[in-house]
């Protein structure tokens, strides 16, 4: 998994000679950043009763890792109400995992500037608002926190259509409720000001699919 994410700014004309990256953000917080990879999107499937489920991904980029392996571009599993997934060989999984490289431009026009030491508490609150349950939030936090808490600050923006329009899931049978939480973030040495994001609530009903993932911009 790549830990160093390269980025480019769309607003190249806004760059001033001699400015630091953090000064650029302070002067022009409405920016788009390009990651090199989308890290660890994982998909949980929660049917009301055990059922066969097929999941395919139409991704505007190159997949670099999937687990379990896809067959003919899709996962086919038996999903149980507790989230356990079983493949044709009888092997079980907690979720479906993928990672890829894309040129998607992530939107940082709104978000949060969080001191590194406050990152865990921030994520606990934000992920709960967004609709992750305790297990899902725990797995999200233990994956990302080691990369974030030692930074002076973290610039965090949750991506919605910007992400889902470039990583399209097709799930059969169709879920009753789908939640896709994707966090784009960047370490900072000094704080910046930007409008706070409004985080939408999510209601689980019937067959529910939950995904989380993220991209570090460094």
Where are each of the predicted segments found?
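C-terminal motif of bacterial Sec signal peptides marking the signal peptidase cleavage site
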Residues: 15-18
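Repetitive helical segments and hydrophobic/amphipathic motifs
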Residues: 11-12
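Positively charged n-region of N-terminal signal peptides that target proteins for export
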Residues: 1-4
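Protease-labile, long low-complexity intrinsically disordered regions enriched in Pro/Ser/Thr
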Residues: 21-218
């Amino acid at each position: 998994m790549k830990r160093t994410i390269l980025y480019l700014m769309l607003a190249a004309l806004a760059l001033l000679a001699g400015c630091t990256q953090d000064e650029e953000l302070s002067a022009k917080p409405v920016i788009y950043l390009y990651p090199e990879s989308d890290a660890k999107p994982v998909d949980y499937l929660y049917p009301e009763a055990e059922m066969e489920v097929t999941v395919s991904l139409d991704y505007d980029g190159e997949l670099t890792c999937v687990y379990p392996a896809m067959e003919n571009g899709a996962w086919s599993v038996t999903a149980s109400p507790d989230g356990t997934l079983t493949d044709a060989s009888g092997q079980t999984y907690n979720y479906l995992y993928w990672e890829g490289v894309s040129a998607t431009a992530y939107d940082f026009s709104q978000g949060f500037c969080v001191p590194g030491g406050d990152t865990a508490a921030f994520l606990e609150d934000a992920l709960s608002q967004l609709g992750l349950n305790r297990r899902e939030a725990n797995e999200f936090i233990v994956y990302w926190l080691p990369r974030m808490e030692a930074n002076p600050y973290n610039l965090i923006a949750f991506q919605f259509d910007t992400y889902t329009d470039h990583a399209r899931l097709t799930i059969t049978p169709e879920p009753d409720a789908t939640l896709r939480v994707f966090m784009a973030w960047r370490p900072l040495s000094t704080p910046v000001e930007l409008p706070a994001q409004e985080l939408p609530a999510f209601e689980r009903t019937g067959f529910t699919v939950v995904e989380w993932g993220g991209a570090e911009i460094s």
